[in-house]
């Protein structure tokens, strides 16, 4: 993938950039792997806003991704690399020997025609999926499970990868995540070899507000320009200070620097080294 710089034909396009989609080999998705989805605009079942600054956006179909990779011992051929509007990574269309089709996250270096496998005794090759206990130390991995059989939850964004540092015992392995956090993960969990593709996604510049609206984002208004009944920073004559010793969230809680990690969380015992540890 390469980054396209647009000509400054307007102020909105002056610093805009995008992908050339050179890796994409198929433009129309597999119909049997599509699910319709409706946008909720950040509302819950009661109609209350639970996530601010969401709404609108282009209509999208959800691509059903195989995060479990549990068809062991069966070869799957990569038939296409496709764009997925629901995530930053590209996806790969697989055709299994028994005729089943599925999507997986497209790892860096995976090409059309390659064969990928899942199972215990598969090769340490990009795109293959196996249990962490069968992966050598130092291997780059992605698409990592946290609970056996639940499906991958970690290292799924474009360009992201983790590294398997070692095996402490038969039950746990030590993995260094992209954030720098080092944590223990059950050795029975599966992971996929390699890093997620589309690694230059982070270099794309949105360029203009309208392009963000296409993605389903609405404007973010500063609290200091609101009324005092809408935000703790609001009110005052003209451009006034926030009136608090620390910045506040819209709900009156300290923010911008306040620690939000619960050190009594059950997952704390699995963290060997925090991401902000010096």
Swiss-Prot record:
<dbReference type="InterPro" id="IPR022669">
    <property type="entry name" value="Ribosomal_uL2_C"/>
</dbReference>
<dbReference type="Pfam" id="PF03947">
    <property type="entry name" value="Ribosomal_L2_C"/>
</dbReference>
<keyword id="KW-0694">RNA-binding</keyword>
<dbReference type="GO" id="GO:0002181">
    <property type="term" value="P:cytoplasmic translation"/>
</dbReference>
<comment type="subunit">
    <text>Part of the 50S ribosomal subunit. Forms a bridge to the 30S subunit in the 70S ribosome.</text>
</comment>
<dbReference type="Pfam" id="PF00181">
    <property type="entry name" value="Ribosomal_L2"/>
</dbReference>
<protein>
    <recommendedName>
        <fullName>Large ribosomal subunit protein uL2</fullName>
    </recommendedName>
</protein>
<dbReference type="GO" id="GO:0019843">
    <property type="term" value="F:rRNA binding"/>
</dbReference>
<dbReference type="InterPro" id="IPR022666">
    <property type="entry name" value="Ribosomal_uL2_RNA-bd_dom"/>
</dbReference>
<keyword id="KW-0689">Ribosomal protein</keyword>
<dbReference type="InterPro" id="IPR005880">
    <property type="entry name" value="Ribosomal_uL2_bac/org-type"/>
</dbReference>
<dbReference type="InterPro" id="IPR012340">
    <property type="entry name" value="NA-bd_OB-fold"/>
</dbReference>
<comment type="function">
    <text>One of the primary rRNA binding proteins. Required for association of the 30S and 50S subunits to form the 70S ribosome, for tRNA binding and peptide bond formation. It has been suggested to have peptidyltransferase activity; this is somewhat controversial. Makes several contacts with the 16S rRNA in the 70S ribosome.</text>
</comment>
<dbReference type="InterPro" id="IPR008991">
    <property type="entry name" value="Translation_prot_SH3-like_sf"/>
</dbReference>
<dbReference type="InterPro" id="IPR002171">
    <property type="entry name" value="Ribosomal_uL2"/>
</dbReference>
<dbReference type="InterPro" id="IPR014726">
    <property type="entry name" value="Ribosomal_uL2_dom3"/>
</dbReference>
<dbReference type="InterPro" id="IPR022671">
    <property type="entry name" value="Ribosomal_uL2_CS"/>
</dbReference>
<dbReference type="GO" id="GO:0003735">
    <property type="term" value="F:structural constituent of ribosome"/>
</dbReference>
<feature type="compositionally biased region" description="Basic residues">
    <location>
        <begin position="255"/>
        <end position="264"/>
    </location>
</feature>
<dbReference type="GO" id="GO:0015934">
    <property type="term" value="C:large ribosomal subunit"/>
</dbReference>
<keyword id="KW-0699">rRNA-binding</keyword>
<keyword id="KW-0687">Ribonucleoprotein</keyword>
<comment type="similarity">
    <text>Belongs to the universal ribosomal protein uL2 family.</text>
</comment>
<dbReference type="GO" id="GO:0016740">
    <property type="term" value="F:transferase activity"/>
</dbReference>
<feature type="region of interest" description="Disordered">
    <location>
        <begin position="223"/>
        <end position="278"/>
    </location>
</feature>
<dbReference type="InterPro" id="IPR014722">
    <property type="entry name" value="Rib_uL2_dom2"/>
</dbReference>
